[in-house]
Amino acid sequence: MHQKNILTAGVELKESGKALIMIHGRGSTAKNILSISSYLNVDGYTLIAPQATNNTWYPYTFLEPPAHNEPWLSSAIALIGELVSELAKTIDKKNIYILGFSQGACLTLEFVTRNAERYGGCIAFTGGLIGDKIYTDN
């Protein structure tokens, strides 16, 4: 499953008071998603980018039933949850932003749907909720 392999950039969390978790897409890397920060208004943020095992968060398309993407999907959601929990020890969740691109956007949306709280924001570049239908239990 996914290991806690994290790249960081930007300002130290104790100084910034706000963090952006950046989740890459299938076939990409944490380093690559961090590179788009130069196009975003994130001066003064702590940037955190987890790396997916084998550059993919889950094996199949996001339109498959979630069970088809297990156990990888649950592992990815747990990793994002662990990052949010660690950040929340230092900063308020309303200062935690989560951004994803493609497969990372799907994971971002799935995480915030399953863990609904007052985050600073959720940014999804080209993604949707995971599954062949809306799973209201999530």
Q: Locations of the language-model features?
A:
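Structural motif
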Residues: 18-19, 95-97, 121
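Hydrolases whose catalytic domains are alpha/beta-hydrolase-1, hotdog thioesterase
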Residues: 107-111, 133
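A conserved short beta-strand
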Residues: 117-130
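The feature captures the conserved acid-bearing segment of alpha/beta-hydrolase catalytic domains
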Residues: 11-12, 129-138
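Active-site signature of alpha/beta-hydrolase-fold catalytic machinery across serine-
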Residues: 35, 110-114
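Alpha/beta-hydrolase-fold catalytic nucleophile elbow
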Residues: 51, 99, 123-126
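Gly/Ala-rich beta-loop-alpha elbow adjacent to hydrolase catalytic centers
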Residues: 99-104, 108
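Serine-hydrolase catalytic machinery in alpha/beta-hydrolase-like enzymes
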Residues: 2-91
